[in-house]
């Protein structure tokens, strides 16, 4: 009798995706983040589901309902802390996953990469609408400031903003629809993840060398299931430590004050994972220009496959490009720091220089470095 997992229509799909999947024999720990992101998504959906059972999306009771979850619901404090810090873990894994893709040339799987960028944008949208739900000061003012950016769109801008608000300001209608968006988007993300994996399994994984790994493949199970399990244990350890010991470390103290439309907080800033984009937005003194730069900061990822000039896929054997990659990493950390600082000198000029460098590195310097390295590697006989 043949094995059930190889014949049953449903089991067959699971088998080809997670058990008998041929995987390169030399993929490093940087390839763990895909599975970690899957686990993060499951954690967020489950904790979110239990939070939604007790949350009320009404301006009068939203803040109180979150306090009620933390005080009166069995393990409500834990569910809420896991959900809030789970978002931080999600973005940490996302940034590392994208960084891995850039470093090792995974973006040359164009369909997988493009779906990945759409996924990144969808997760960012989900996190933004989710941050509004507790209806604290930073929730309210964050929603007001970011939705207001759409008014920079010529002609239809102000109409569009009022349409999204469902009125003339961020109010009950806005909160209700943001809750609806926050509930539906994770399921859309799940569908996109399946498409992401579908495209990935068409080509198979890349590997650190950037060389075609077809000649040396090993089954996913048990080799990479056990490796992913180790990554999972480490991530759960970090997440639980955060949620148990310092759950509010990454949050904003202003969000412990109920939303008040009459009182603006001194420094409006998003969660840490949006600070780099927020810094780029603020570095341009023009409203429409800032919005376009904000969009470009993420959408620039879509043109990375077109900017690949090197004959080698990975940066593993390309020292000049490696230096530029780590400059880009340091630059993003600088932007993250600047995004959390007040709008005053020297932070303004640092933010502007870091924003220029961010785009220059991706669009100009890295493609040039690829061409230079190719030229240096060409045999030059007399």
Curated annotation (Swiss-Prot):
UniProt membrane topology term: Multi-pass membrane protein
GO molecular function annotations of the record: metal ion binding; ubiquinol-cytochrome-c reductase activity
Gene3D superfamilies in the record: Cytochrome Bc1 Complex, Chain C
Keyword line: Electron transport, Heme, Iron, Membrane, Metal-binding, Mitochondrion, Mitochondrion inner membrane, Respiratory chain, Transmembrane, Transmembrane helix, Transport, Ubiquinone
GO cellular component, one term: mitochondrial inner membrane
Binding site for heme b b562: 83, 182
Entry keyword Electron transport: yes
Cofactor(s) needed for function: heme b
Entry note: cofactor: Binds 2 heme b groups non-covalently.
Transmembrane segments: 33-53, 77-98, 113-133, 178-198, 226-246, 288-308, 320-340, 347-367
Cystine residue pairs: none
Localization, UniProt: Mitochondrion inner membrane
Binding sites annotated in the UniProt record for heme b b566: 97, 196
Chief site of localization: mitochondrion
Biological process according to GO: mitochondrial electron transport, ubiquinol to cytochrome c
A Pfam family recorded for this sequence: Cytochrome_B
PROSITE patterns tied to this protein: CYTB_CTER, CYTB_NTER
Binding site for a ubiquinone: 201
Family matches, as InterPro entries: Cyt_b/b6_C, Cyt_b/b6_C_sf, Cyt_b/b6_N, Cytb/b6-like_sf, Cytochrome_b, Cytochrome_b_C_euk/bac, Cytochrome_b_N_euk/bac, Di-haem_cyt_TM
Xref: PANTHER family: CYTOCHROME B
Assembly description: The cytochrome bc1 complex contains 11 subunits: 3 respiratory subunits (MT-CYB, CYC1 and UQCRFS1), 2 core proteins (UQCRC1 and UQCRC2) and 6 low-molecular weight proteins (UQCRH/QCR6, UQCRB/QCR7, UQCRQ/QCR8, UQCR10/QCR9, UQCR11/QCR10 and a cleavage product of UQCRFS1). This cytochrome bc1 complex then forms a dimer.
Function summary: Component of the ubiquinol-cytochrome c reductase complex (complex III or cytochrome b-c1 complex) that is part of the mitochondrial respiratory chain. The b-c1 complex mediates electron transfer from ubiquinol to cytochrome c. Contributes to the generation of a proton gradient across the mitochondrial membrane that is then used for ATP synthesis.
Family membership noted in the UniProt record: Belongs to the cytochrome b family.
Miscellaneous comment in the UniProt entry for this protein: Heme 1 (or BL or b562) is low-potential and absorbs at about 562 nm, and heme 2 (or BH or b566) is high-potential and absorbs at about 566 nm.
UniProt-recorded name of the protein: Cytochrome b
Organism: Monodelphis adusta
Gene: MT-CYB
């Amino acid at each position: 009798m043949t094995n059930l997992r190889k014949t049953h229509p449903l089991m067959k799909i699971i088998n080809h995706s997670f058990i008998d999947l041929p995987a390169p024999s030399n993929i490093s720990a940087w390839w763990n983040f895909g599975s970690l992101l899957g686990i993060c998504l499951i954690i967020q959906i489950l904790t979110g589901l239990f939070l939604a059972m007790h949350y009320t999306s009404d301006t009068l009771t939203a803040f109180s309902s979150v306090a009620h979850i933390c005080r009166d619901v069995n393990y409500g404090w834990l569910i809420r802390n896991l959900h809030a810090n789970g978002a931080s873990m999600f973005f940490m894994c996302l940034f590392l996953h994208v960084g891995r893709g850039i470093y090792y040339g995974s973006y040359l799987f164009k369909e997988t990469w493009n779906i990945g960028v759409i996924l990144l944008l969808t997760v960012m949208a989900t996190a933004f609408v989710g941050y509004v739900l507790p209806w604290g000061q930073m929730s309210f003012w964050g929603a007001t400031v970011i939705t207001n950016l759409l008014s920079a769109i010529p002609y239809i801008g102000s109409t569009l903003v009022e349409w999204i608000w469902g009125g003339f300001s961020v109010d009950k209608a806005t909160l209700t629809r943001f809750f609806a968006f926050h509930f539906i988007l994770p399921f859309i993300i799940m569908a996109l993840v399946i498409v992401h994996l579908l495209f990935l399994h068409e080509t198979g994984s890349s590997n650190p060398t950037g060389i075609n790994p077809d000649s040396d493949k090993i089954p996913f199970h048990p080799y990479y299931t056990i490796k992913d399990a180790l990554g999972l244990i480490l991530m759960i350890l970090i997440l639980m430590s955060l949620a148990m010991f310092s759950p509010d470390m990454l949050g904003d103290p202003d969000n412990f004050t109920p939303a008040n439309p009459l009182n603006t907080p001194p420094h409006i800033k998003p969660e840490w994972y949006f600070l780099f984009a927020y810094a780029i937005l603020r570095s341009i003194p023009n409203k429409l220009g800032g919005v376009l730069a904000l969009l470009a900061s993420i959408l620039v990822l879509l043109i990375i496959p077109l900017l690949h000039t090197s004959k080698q896929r990975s940066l593993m054997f390309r020292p000049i490009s490696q230096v530029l990659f780590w400059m880009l990493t340091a630059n993003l950390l600088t932007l993250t720091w600047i995004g959390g600082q007040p709008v005053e000198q020297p932070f303004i000029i640092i933010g502007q220089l870091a924003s220029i460098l961010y785009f220059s590195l991706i669009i100009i310097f890295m493609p040039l470095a690829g061409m230079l390295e190719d030229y240096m590697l060409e045999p030059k006989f007399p």
